[in-house]
Amino acid sequence: MKAIVRQSYLDKIAKYLGKDTIIIIVGQRRVGKSYTLRLFRDKVAEDIRANIIFIDKEKHEFGDIQTDRDLNAYIDERRDKTKTNYILVDEVQDIEGFENSIRGYYEEPDIEIIVTGSSSNMLSGDLANKIGGRYKEIFVQALSYEEFMEFHELPDSDDTLAKYIQFGGLPGLKKIGLDEQDAREYQTDVYSTVLLKDVIKRNNIRNVPFLENLAHFLADNAGKIISANSIAKYMRSQGENITSTAIINYAKYLCESYMIHKVNRYDIHGRKIFESNDKFYFEDNGIRNSLVGGSRERDIEKVIENIIYNHLVRLGYEVMVGQLQAGEIDFVCTKAKGERIYVQASYIIADDNTYEREFGNLRAIKDNYPKYVISMTPLVTKSDDNGITHLHLRRFLTNGLER
């Protein structure tokens, strides 16, 4: 099988090498972190000045490496001080006290450290305090639409986009194939693995049925503004008496696994971030679809919004939900140096009411930052409507944000 290189991630790794920096590759399980690490390993192996120390905690052969002492012993036995030693550890959070090892090695002149992890809290507490800002995170996402086409050898077409909307972007589907039942079984397996290893075990979850109900609720309500109180009310209607505090904690645990992302609301006029009532999106829309029983036509707006959110993050934006006095802006996106854009996500602009909701809300923002509507409206590829750029979803996913 032809190896497919996700070059942008390898370029990011190369950018941080040789700078006394720990490189941490993060993201949900099965989105390609391990694959990226192995591609880097294979590339470095071509250099005779490199000594590679590779540990994959998901492989049985590394099962004896349980603690930082085990890790130190393994590294010391294989270290060659006459070369550059690349310490590569996959799923490093599965080693108890790993932060002690990282702290001990990262300033050594002959060592580069690159690790992967599936929990956003792996750098919390002790390690973050010890190393300060001496680390760089590289966030690996599920496949983009363009990567999906490359992985599955498909052309850029409406049919391929429909497949991407339905199946999502887990790289493992290349081997599984795009049969609906096989794909759903694989997505369900990935979901179960994330839930067990990165949520339940890591946080000692006892109320597993509620956790699963919460994940399904967030899948069914992706892209909707949600509060802990509204979830508690729904759960009570299902016979579960859960406190708002428990809901907040369980939602946080799900987000720490990178499977789900919480997006804050931003008051566009008041220029402040609200502390409640957020939106949630899934890292992979295929997993989201599998949790609600498959790709449903009535969910198309939610899935499109989910896809647009993930691609905006891929383009390097920090994304929030915009709040106006008389409406909502799906995404307020910012970058460094004050760059900002506003984006509305829609399925099809088919009538005046939909047009006014999407375009009218953008016109209510009285500033000169770029404004976009992204939809699947037929015959639209790119158009301008009084300064608002209307892009077809396919064009956005292949060309980015054009003016």
Q: What is the role of each PLM region?
A:
Residues 180-339:
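Accessory nucleic acid-recognition modules appended to NTPase machines
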